[in-house]
UniProtKB/Swiss-Prot annotation:
Protein name per UniProt: tRNA(Met) cytidine acetate ligase
Entry similarity comment: Belongs to the TmcAL family.
Functional summary from the UniProt entry: Catalyzes the formation of N(4)-acetylcytidine (ac(4)C) at the wobble position of elongator tRNA(Met), using acetate and ATP as substrates. First activates an acetate ion to form acetyladenylate (Ac-AMP) and then transfers the acetyl group to tRNA to form ac(4)C34.
InterPro entries named in the record: Cyt_trans-like (IPR004821), Rossmann-like_a/b/a_fold (IPR014729), tRNA(Met)_cyd_acetate_ligase (IPR008513)
Database matches in NCBIfam families: cyt_tran_rel, PRK13670.1
Reaction(s) the record says it catalyses: cytidine(34) in elongator tRNA(Met) + acetate + ATP = N(4)-acetylcytidine(34) in elongator tRNA(Met) + AMP + diphosphate
Root EC class: ligase
Organism: Leuconostoc mesenteroides subsp. mesenteroides (strain ATCC 8293 / DSM 20343 / BCRC 11652 / CCM 1803 / JCM 6124 / NCDO 523 / NBRC 100496 / NCIMB 8023 / NCTC 12954 / NRRL B-1118 / 37Y)
Subcellular location: Cytoplasm
Source species, domain of life: Bacteria
Any one annotated GO CC term: cytoplasm
Key words of the record: ATP-binding, Cytoplasm, Ligase, Nucleotide-binding, RNA-binding, tRNA processing, tRNA-binding
Main subcellular location: cytoplasm
Residues that, per the record, bind ATP: 7-20, 101, 152, 177
Length: 390
């Protein structure tokens, strides 16, 4: 069977994702669509609106055949690590191609990746008046003439670089994003496709009815099951502030990505009685020219999850394939490839796995449950892959 891979967050699943799946099958003639999907926390360092099982169900009902979890130690990372982890998993699963959205699908990303500068080389990366991403983009443009600005182009280059670095036998097929741009904040009632960020914004404003033209039935059903959604504003900040005010600066300094004195800035700001009173205002108070909003946000999530440097580094060296769900076609594909798969395949998590290989995902799942409204189910131990009959 020929397989095409897609790398996703589905936060939430919308009509643009259906277009992506359809194009992936059409352009490759694949028999099976394999999605590597972020778990309960996404790349920006935020909890997903719906848990990984709800989002898996949405995917299976709309054309995906096999959903594999992108572990927390890859999912909540800068684009190059996110991409590298996703390609590791798809390569282990034997996919022939990956198809992804891009703002500039005409670009030869593999060619650019071959010319791209090695990350963090050069004096310009020691210039603290700009973010790492800005420094990288400037050096890349100087060496390749390619202006790297858009989020999906950044991920596209990450995928291409990962394929080259891993010598993975995977072809890449960029496609134009359908109608909506990543940063679009609004959409009209006439639109059938909107960006995930604009949908999240509409939900945040309580405009549930507004989004029903831009999401499939499976997402509408999940929206009606409000018990499983995140109570972000009231719970996330309270839990995080507790960590920031009770941990010592030394303890905060052990957290992954807590670099260049960020722990002092975090602790000082959190302990200031007249300081920021919300999560968003806290980030604005602590960010600098050196660190993007998203970088600060990810570091705060690592703090909430208490992920230390050595834990993250060890986990990244020991990846696995956690099966979240499949169709009959996906099950057939797994049976066909399971003897050739180069990473551990995990379908059921018991307490021993939760304390070892999957410890970070298990912890992330428990914290997501705490953040969710009443009624959110357990996320890992005893949960079996979902099955959807096509």
């Amino acid at each position: 069977m020929q397989a095409v891979g897609i790398i996703t967050e589905y936060n939430p699943f919308h009509n643009g994702h259906i277009y992506h799946i359809q194009q992936a099958k059409k352009l490759t003639g694949a028999d099976v669509v394999v999605a590597v999907m972020s778990g309960n926390f996404v790349q920006r360092g935020e909890p997903a609106l719906f848990d990984k099982w709800q989002r898996t169900q949405m995917a299976l009902e709309n054309g995906v055949d096999l959903v594999i979890e992108l572990p927390t130690f890859f999912a909540v990372q800068p684009s190059h690590i996110f991409a590298d982890g996703a390609i590791q998993l798809l390569s282990a699963l034997g996919v022939d191609n990956i198809v992804f959205g891009s703002e500039h699908p005409e670009v030869d990303f593999l060619s650019i990746a071959k010319q791209a500068p090695t990350i963090a080389e050069g004096q310009e990366f020691k210039n603290h008046t700009q973010t790492f991403a800005s420094a990288y983009a400037k050096q890349l443009e100087a060496e390749t003439s390619f202006k790297l600005e858009e989020p999906n182009d950044i991920l596209a280059l990450g995928y291409a670089s990962a394929i080259l670095n891993q010598q993975a036998n995977i072809g890449i097929i960029p496609i134009q994003r359908a109608e909506a741009n990543y940063h679009d904040a609004n959409f009209t009632d006439e639109q059938s496709i909107a960006s995930a960020s604009s949908i999240r914004l509409a939900l945040h404003k309580g405009k549930t009815e507004k989004i029903k033209n831009v999401v499939p039935e499976a997402t509408k059903v999940a929206l009606d099951t409000a018990a499983n959604t995140i109570d972000f504003e009231s719970k996330f900040w309270s839990m995080l502030k507790y960590r920031l005010t009770t941990d010592t600066v030394g303890q905060l300094g052990q957290i992954y990505q807590m670099a260049e004195g960020l722990e002092h800035r975090f602790a000082k700001t959190a302990l200031n009685d007249s300081g920021p009173q919300s999560y968003q205002s806290f980030i604005k108070s602590t960010k600098s020219k050196r660190y993007t909003f998203t970088r600060i946000q990810r570091t705060l999530l690592y703090t909430l999850l208490n992920i230390k440097v050595d834990q993250m580094q060890a986990a990244m060296q020991d990846p696995y394939l956690r099966i979240l769900g499949f169709t009959s076609t996906g099950q057939q594909y797994l049976n066909e490839i399971k003897k050739q798969v180069t990473l551990p395949l995990i379908s059921k998590v018991d307490s021993s796995l939760a304390k070892s290989n999957l410890r970070l995902d298990y912890k992330a799942g428990k914290v997501w449950q705490l953040l969710a409204n009443e009624g959110a189910p357990t996320q890992d131990v005893t949960r079996m892959p979902l099955y959807w009959e096509k």
